[in-house]
Curated annotation (Swiss-Prot):
The keyword Membrane applies. The chain crosses the membrane at residues 25-45, 347-367, 369-389, 396-416, 440-460, 472-492, 537-557, 863-883, 888-908, 910-930, 968-988, 998-1018. One of its GO terms (molecular function) is xenobiotic transmembrane transporter activity. It comes from Salmonella schwarzengrund (strain CVM19633). This is Multidrug resistance protein MdtB.
Length: 1040
């Protein structure tokens, strides 16, 4: 290490000390750039790390899960499977709906993925059913990502079908056009339609069939081109009354003649205005409603998107009748803004605490002002670089700046303390600034680059976790770099002009008391250090025991992935027996809603029943529970969830699964609980054999709670077993049978009514009110070869069987997903290990594969790379220190301080009841960079004393420890108080910030005590080792 000799003229700081105007203007430029940058920074909950995800939904009313899988999902999957950059493809095929979710690699732009999906859909079109009502529709949205905003549209005066028609046309479409919106859905499905309910007995009495009626309706309602007449002088467009617009028009439609008399549709059917799908319903606080869910595109800024929607809502609602009310039930940005505000407050508090510590140690207002200027200047200047890198103001970048508060003041403190020491010896302020800054310049550079070296591995973390912490690491590194620049330029210049012997010597009663206290502390430390140096092997034993303890604590501490946040919104799934109908589910949701709304923490509730792209089966319902603001309720979200589940548990025939919404969404499907684990096979039969066994085994594990699976193979099904020979003899084809059944029971969309603003469907079905259940099949009649009609029972036998309610695929193979939570007292790491052990115990065959999904999969990947990440940070720091010191030995002395930080952090986490998650791991990595600065300051001065004053290694390190004790204590306390607001945070988003603060405060407390004694002993040990090596190998020269 090159140390500037006494009498140096300031080194890199000289120019800035001697040119105060230029220095001031340079700092003003940094400040101005930061202020301007801050105004352009967007606000977000977390850095944008979403996987490019696209959802493809295909609706085919009346189709069974098996038909949806084979006729719709499989052809689409074959085409999607050929797309480049596809990371994972999952699908869910249920009665009448197919949902395929495509997750692409992080590096693939969403627009490129969109083009590939559209091309794949086009290629699969010819393979899809010809009577598919609508082609597959894709949306740039992750279905597992909760809506950024939920609105309820209600009316006391208008039917819900009319309300939805207006809202869909006037509101939903406009919101869909907002930049960042990926999908707007109207839950409840009350789209207007003309419903034709055939009276099977009346139709049969007239010798007609449902197919006859369908053909008559489709032929009577058309909307096609008719041409034009082009004469010598005039052109005439041809038009006709080929469309029927209302239920009355259809009611008067003649469908046949009997004995010369017309038979109108109204004679054999009930024709009415109704909903397109009568098996869909949504409620807001138990009142029927159209619930509008707004989801963002992956990567879109949630705050900017929600602000745009809020701005246009008043204008959109003005176009609606006064009886239609639009209410914002939930807005995720409310909690995001509150969380950011709390973090900003903690940042300001950290700055105030750090400045207070500086004044406590320096007891001089001018000396306090100097670092008081350096801290905000370094932090504000960081905003300019953040804008350039397309970062945002989010919880992680604000946490980085809060932690940086303790870092950036370190450099200024070290410079001020060294310059003040020379002024107190009688040097002139300018000479002291030149000499002190020149002497300390290399130390500042060592501190800065060794700390940045710790952050380098974070930049190379892969997948979504790496993307998540890149903004954190870069923001912190930029703040540290700017701090170093400020400390080598502005700080010594201000010292030269603001400090003097008079100001430093001026003391009041408080200053003298503090000085006496510090003198006593330093004296006590000196006596303790002398004893430690006289018993080096005992000290080394303590250091070695600390290393072993850190390894043991690392093994036993509970491990998690990402803190569970309280964002004030709970997602729920209500599960009922597999044979449940829509009517029974609607009744059950009313009972559950009544219990939930009685809870004092609940502000509003939306529920949805029915099968669409969001809800897979009739025996399940979706819930969104919006809680009161955190300061208006007594309990956190997990306590509210426990209370709600207890309240609902007494309702027979239902199971309620609840989980809090999170800002970080890695999953690709809505799950009942927080964590997922999949079981995949080549056939459904293999799944049906192993799913019950594995589920029973998982439910018996104490490390898991609320274990469930989406495997539902006990749905009731009526199997129509057609005697093909009998049917052929009567001239009846299988297509005739399918059409007759579809016409009767499929809510078949048989025709379209076109208007200037929208399109509406004509729905055909049998009126089954008088013949419920399987008896309705006896009313089905088919047309035979001779024109007569025969009952279905003449050619078919009806069997009652069990069938799957939904069929799920993962990468084109059958799969079932197990969902689970982790009970109190256990960690996600415990749960994962228990599942892996259970797999081994069951000895699953080779054709059965298992895989963790979503956050559980990310946890496994992060856990596997954590140790290597810490090793990489240590190696990077060793390389940087080795280059700076031109030594192989001294970096090891400095790095010997690291186990103390690990022990302190892990002990603090265990005592606080926190898991070792990725936030806490980042804290430990930062500690690696912080605690080594104590050793750097000691060793720098010890080496200087050895080389310049000829001191012995023992005397040099002893003097260095006493000389640098005050700045070491000051900088450590500054870093500790910078992290303290995070550790003590209680507001919105505190779950995210607290592990970082706990790890850093615990690590700093323990390392501060131990390293002050272990570092000098290890320094002397390696000094003796170096002399031994030189004596054994005289030709080997090592500049230690």
């Amino acid at each position: 290490m090159q140390v500037l000799p006494p009498g140096s003229t300031g080194g890199p700081s000289r120019l800035f000390i001697l040119r105060p105007v230029a220095t001031t203007l340079l700092m003003a430029a940094i400040l101005l750039a930061g202020i301007i940058g801050y105004r352009f920074l967007p606000v977000a909950a977390l850095p944008e790390v979403d996987y490019p995800t696209i959802q493809v939904v295909t609706l085919y009313p009346g189709a069974s899960p098996d038909v949806m899988t084979s006729a719709v999902t499989a052809p689409l999957e074959r085409q999607f499977g050929q797309m480049s950059g596809l990371k994972q493809m999952s699908s869910q095929s249920s009665g009448g709906a197919s949902v395929v979710t495509l997750q692409f690699q992080l590096t693939l732009p969403l627009d490129v993925a969109e083009q590939e999906v559209q091309a794949a859909i086009n290629a699969a079109t010819n393979l899809l059913p010809s009577d598919l009502p609508n082609p597959p529709i894709y949306s740039k949205v992750n279905p597992a990502d909760p809506p950024i905003m939920t609105l309820a549209v209600t009316s006391n005066a208008m039917p819900m079908t009319q309300v939805e028609d207006m809202v869909e046309t006037r509101v939903a479409q406009k919101i869909s056009q907002v930049s960042g919106v990926g999908l707007v859905t109207l839950a409840g499905g009350q789209r207007p339609a003309v419903r034709v309910k055939l009276n099977a007995q009346a139709v049969a009495a007239l010798g007609l069939t449902s197919e006859t009626v369908r053909t008559a309706i489709t032929g009577a309602n058309v909307n096609s081109a008719k041409g034009s007449l082009d004469g010598p002088e005039r052109a005439v467009t041809l038009s006709a009354n080929d469309q029927m617009q209302s239920a009355d028009d259809y009611r008067r439609l003649i469908i046949a003649y009997q004995n010369g008399a017309p038979v109108r549709l109204g004679d054999v059917a009930t024709v009415e205005q109704g909903a397109e799908n009568s098996w869909l319903g949504a409620w807001a606080n138990q009142a029927p409603a159209n619930v509008m869910n707004v989801q963002r595109q992956p990567g879109a800024n949630i705050i900017a998107t929600a602000d745009s929607i809020r701005q246009m809502l008043p204008q959109l609602t003005e176009s609606l009748p006064k009886s239609v009310k639009v209410t914002v039930l939930s807005d995720r940005t409310t909690n995001i803004r509150a969380s950011v505000r709390d973090t900003q407050f903690e940042l300001m508090l950290a700055i105030a605490l750090v400045v207070m510590i500086i004044y406590l140690f320096l007891r001089n207002i001018p000396a306090t002002i100097i670092p008081g200027v350096a801290v905000p200047l370094s932090l504000i200047g960081t905003f300019a670089v953040m804008v350039f890198l397309d970062f945002s103001i989010n919880n992680l970048t604000l946490m980085a700046l809060t932690i940086a508060t303790g870092f950036v003041v370190d450099d200024a403190i070290v410079v001020i303390e060294n310059i003040s020491r020379y002024i107190e010896k009688g040097e002139k302020p300018l000479a002291a600034a030149l000499k002190g800054a020149g002497e300390i310049g290399f130390t500042i550079i060592s501190l800065t680059f060794s700390l940045i070296a710790v952050l380098i591995p974070l930049l190379f973390m892969g997948d979504i976790v790496g993307r998540l912490f890149r903004e954190f690491a870069v923001t912190l590194a930029v703040a540290i770099l700017i701090s170093a620049v400020v400390s080598l330029t502005l700080t010594p210049m201000m010292c030269a002009r603001m400090l003097s012997q008079q100001s430093l010597r001026k003391q009041n009663r408080f200053s003298r008391a503090c000085e006496r206290m510090f003198d006593r502390v330093i004296a006590s430390y000196g006596r303790g250090l002398a004893k430690v140096l006289n018993h080096p092997w005992l000290t080394l034993s303590v250091a070695f025991a600390t290393l072993l303890l850190s390894v043991m604590l690392w093994i036993v501490i509970p491990k998690g992935f990402f803190p569970v946040q309280d964002n004030g919104i709970i997602q729920g799934t209500l599960q009922a027996p597999q044979s449940s109908s829509y009517a029974s589910m609607a009744q059950r949701q009313r009972q559950v809603a009544e219990r939930i709304l009685q809870d004092p923490a609940v502000q509003s509730l939306t529920t949805f029943v029915g099968v669409d792209g969001a809800n897979p089966t009739l025996n399940s319902a979706r819930l969104q529970i919006n809680l009161k603001p955190l300061d208006a309720r007594d309990d956190r979200v997990q306590q509210v969830i426990s209370r709600l589940q207890t309240a609902v548990a007494t309702i027979p025939g239902v199971a309620l699964y609840l989980q809090p919404t999170q800002d970080l969404t890695i999953d690709t499907q809505v799950s009942r609980t927080q964590y997922q684990f999949t079981l995949q096979a080549t056939t459904l039969d293999a799944l049906s054999h192993w799913v019950p066994k594995l589920q029973n085994a998982l439910q018996s594990l104490p490390q898991l709670s609320e274990v469930s699976s989406d495997w539902q193979d006990r749905g009731l099904a009526a199997w129509v077993n057609v005697d093909r020979d009998s049917a052929s003899r009567l001239g009846i084809s299988m297509a005739d049978v399918d059409n007759a059944l579809y016409n009767a029971f499929g809510q078949r969309l048989i025709s379209t009514i076109y208007t200037q603003a929208n399109q509406y469907r004509v729905v055909l079905e049998h009126n089954t009110a008088s013949t419920p259940g399987l008896a309705a099949l006896e009313t089905i009649r088919l047309t035979s070869r001779d024109g007569g009609t025969v009952p279905l029972s003449a050619i078919a036998r009806i069997e009652q069987r069990f069938a799957p309610l939904s069929i799920n695929h993962l990468d084109q193979f059958p799969v079932t997903t197990f969902s689970f939570n982790v009970p109190e007292g256990y960690s996600l790491g415990d749960a994962v290990q228990a599942i892996l052990d259970t797999e081994k115990t069951l000895a699953l065959p080779a054709d059965i594969t298992t895989q963790f999904q979503g956050s559980t999969l990310a946890f496994q990947a992060a856990l596997g790379s954590t140790v290597w990440l810490i090793v990489a940070a240590v190696v990077a720091m060793y390389i940087v220190l080795g280059v700076l010191y031109e030594s192989f030995i001294h970096p090891i002395t400095i790095l010997s301080t690291l186990p103390t930080a690990g022990v302190g952090a892990l002990l603090a986490l265990i005592i606080a009841g926190s898991e070792l998650d990725i936030i806490a791991i980042i804290g430990i990595i930062l500690l690696i960079g912080i605690v080594k600065k104590n050793a750097i300051m000691m060793i720098d001065f010890a080496l200087a004393a050895e080389r310049e004053q000829g001191m012995s290694p023992r005397d040099a390190i002893f003097q260095a420890c006493l000389l640098r004790f005050r700045p070491i204590l000051m900088t450590t306390l500054a870093a500790l108080l910078g992290a303290l607001p995070l550790m003590l945070s209680t507001g919105v988003g505190a779950e995210l910030r607290r592990p970082l603060g706990i790890a850093m405060v615990g690590g700093l407390l323990v390392s501060q005590v131990l390293t002050l004694f272990t570092t000098p002993v290890i320094y002397l040990l390696f000094d003796r080792l170096s002399l031994y090596v030189k004596s054994r190998f005289p030709r080997h020269k090592e500049e230690a």
